[in-house]
Amino acid sequence: MIQSTQALSKTSERFSKLALSHGKRTRLWRLLYGHGPRNGSLLVLPLDQGLEHGPTDFFPNPPAIDPDYQFRLAVEGNFSAIALGVGLAEKYMGEYCGRIPLILKLNGKTNIPSDAEATSPLFASVEDAVRLGADAVGYTMYVG
């Protein structure tokens, strides 16, 4: 325990030297050390994939279509955070607030139109992320 306390102290000292605001440093600390492996690694459960891929991806594991199942998986599986869209965040984060950090996806795409079109419209804002208590935002870019 003493060794881990010393390591945590050194990590905390390094974090205090980052050129980030207190709020950004706090949110980053929560993601890297407050949840999940707690060793500086980030393990994110991407709950935004239902939008990105559609319901057919859930056929092999029917319980996975239930958002509450996915949230429980994130908490019980010791993930650092979950990534999801604004609709699911508004519906479920009240119940899971403080139990798993939120990375709010600002954009996303569906398989309509086809993958030939790299359309990924914005459907949430940084203001939404702040309102929902997100520790970070996610933005997907399709290059090429």
Regions found by a protein language model. Give the residues of each.
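Alpha/beta enzyme core
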Residues: 2-4, 37, 42-44, 49-144
